[in-house]
Amino acid sequence: MSATTTSASETSTPTCLPIPPKENGYVPPGGCGNIHMYEASFAAPVLFSVLFGLTTIIHIVQAIMFKKRYAWVVIMSSLWELIAFIMRSLFAKNQSSDAYNTPFTIFFLLAPIWVNAFLYMTLGRLIYFFLPSGRLGGIGAKRFGHIFVWLEILAFIIQLVGAAFTTDTEASQETIMRGVHIYMGGIGVQELFILIFTGLFIHLQRKMGEMERHGTLDAEKVGRGSMPWRWLFYAIYASLFLITVRIIFRLAQYADGTNIDNPALRNEWFEYVWDAAPIFICLAILNVAHPGRVLVGPDSEFPRVSRKEKKQRKREKKEAKIAEKEAKKERKRRRKHGSIGVDLLDAQERGSAPTSRPAPGGHGYQGENQRTWYDNRGNEVRP
């Protein structure tokens, strides 16, 4: 999130000074067209572009090598970071241009969410692979991933809305601060989900450790991996810790708003040390301790449903729904006729008529129109 001191609307008023920009486009605070309270470095974003580019390439290779389709999620995180720092490098040469600063801000702020989603999806696969029941805490493995990913999408949307407010060059200071508060709320929600997820992960580790002690943990599955399964847990804990460090920094950075005396807004290195570096280390850890080194084999992934099977299931669901509707209609029809009409309805369905006989007491009938019908219990039925 850029430490904007003046917006476009403010630059048209006498509150900003017509200070000529430097060769790289930088305008000091108070000058018309200023974006940051510091002069952005060129070397730092180039360095991080290289670092995130390397981890992106490695993650792509590992996704293919370990046959982990869901690894596209973590690739998105490193790719967004790469795009962010390419934009930052371009901005460093033209520091009065929002065309580079806005995409940098959005990609930089939102990229870590993809790492969270990847870890959540890994939890579901660990449950499915190692627990015979495929459940943890009464919840199915696949549902775990779905629940946390949707929660992460919620946090993503909140943060995106906040980031959009702060990058609006026409926004007032009040609007920018509203965006800051929305974004802080989004990362606060994200941290809450991380804490819940960490608790579940600890529960899974204890359960697997207990199974291992009792000899019920599948030794064949454990033996497939190229590293101990506990290493993956430690890597995930380290990743969650680094993401939490980054969240705490962001909360502290804007706790006092966009105060010009805030050192976190006046010094560029804060964002590199407490945001860019932790996320890079997190991605590098997942390169070293990739889930694909533990989750080995076709049974380490959720079963894939073919298009033909999906159509068949859809058709079966549709047929079941139609059958259920017909059953409901039948039940309503039977309730409407009451118990005395059950035999009559059954007879009609079989294509036969119910028994007709003279009325009790010797009274018969004289014509078809005056015929009286009775069911097997002797109750009169009016067809």
UniProtKB/Swiss-Prot annotation:
Protein's membrane topology: Multi-pass membrane protein
Coiled-coil regions, chain positions: none
UniProt-annotated location(s): Membrane
Functional note: Probable lipid transporter; part of the gene cluster that mediates the biosynthesis of aspercryptins, linear lipopeptides built from six amino acids including 2 highly unusual and nonproteogenic amino acids, 2-amino-octanoic acid (2aoa) and 2-amino-dodecanol (2adol). The core structure of aspercryptins is as follows: Ser/Ala-Thr-Ile/Val-2aoa-Asn-2adol. The first step of aspercryptin biosynthesis is the generation of the fatty acid precursors, octanoic and dodecanoic acids, by the FAS subunits atnF and atnM.
Residue ranges of the TM segments: 46-66, 71-91, 104-124, 144-164, 182-202, 231-251, 269-289
Family according to the record: Belongs to the lipid-translocating exporter (LTE) (TC 9.A.26.1) family.
Superkingdom of this protein's organism: Eukaryota
Basic residues: bias regions: 307-316
Tagged with keyword Amino-acid biosynthesis: no
This protein's record includes keyword Transmembrane helix: yes
Disruption of the gene: reported phenotype: Eliminates more than 70% of aspercryptin production.
Cellular component aspect of the GO annotation: membrane
Inducing stimuli: Expression is positively regulated by the aspercryptin cluser-specific transcription factor atnN.
Gene: atnI
Compositionally biased region (Basic and acidic residues): 317-329
Region (Disordered): 305-383
Database matches in Pfam families: RTA1
Name by which UniProt lists this protein: Probable lipid transporter atnI
